[in-house]
Amino acid sequence: MTTHETQQSAMPSVWSPDAARLISFVLQFWFDNRRPPNTADVYHGAGFDDYTARRLYRELQLGFAAVVLDDRLQLNIVKALPFSATPTPHKLMVDGHFIAYLGCPGEAFSVSGLPMLDGIQYQVESYCACCYQPIRLSYFGPELQTPADELPTVAVVGNPHMWEHGVPADRVCDDFHFTLDDAHAERFGQRIGRRQLTMKSEQLAALSRPISQRRMRDPASRVWLDAEMHMNGFASVGVDISMWRAADDLGSAE
């Protein structure tokens, strides 16, 4: 998902070496096998027993890189960003073959930074949240090749204050949706009974780019969601965040 790190947070920005190794192993295994690894896969492939893996998964969850049922003996992986074990509208396809579900529209763009996609053509297949008409993004390596006039709109039906400080990634992803255009975004918001903020695909892609460029490459890729920094990030790419600011004003009113 998209985020800006707060410099004021005490949360370290760098993964421990073992956490960095584990998330890289999980993503590569998932890409190669079309599924997340289980505890035996992690033990044989990365060398971490279940006690160590549980501790590392908790570190990855706090750094917004994974969602794991760490209270379960099997340590079931729900998400390892950008991949999702739960079916979503967004599918990564390579040579016509399904690779993995992606968590949300933000991950439909940030997936482009994965090293295993360098130098190949692939697609993200999705659909409009309003009418279920198909949406398709085409890539070559990190480059989005879909013409601008064919890109979908993004409807955001949550507020950054709902996403910050340890909220799991799958909860954040649930607030981001592709729609065919602004009119479909408005109808989607009406249908689910929420106000939506509307943004362009290019804006979300720009927000996702710093994350995508660092994933599996830079150990300083740990993130910490902070509402103010997040809103400033959206504003920096031209998104109208007046709706969110109005909610801030309401919250501070006496």
Segment roles from a protein language model:
Residues 2-24:
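Short alpha-helical segments that sit at the start of domains
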Residues 13-19, 71-95, 141:
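Short, cationic-aromatic polyanion-contact patches
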Residues 21-35:
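Short helix->loop/beta-hairpin flanking segments within DNA-binding domains
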Residues 32-45:
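Short acidic, hydrophobic short linear motifs in intrinsically disordered regions
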Residues 47-62:
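Short amphipathic alpha-helical interaction segments
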Residues 61-73:
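A short, conserved structural fragment
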Residues 79-117:
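Short, amphipathic alpha-helical interaction segments positioned at domain boundaries
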Residues 96, 100-107, 117-120, 130, ...:
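Long, low-complexity, charge-rich intrinsically disordered regions
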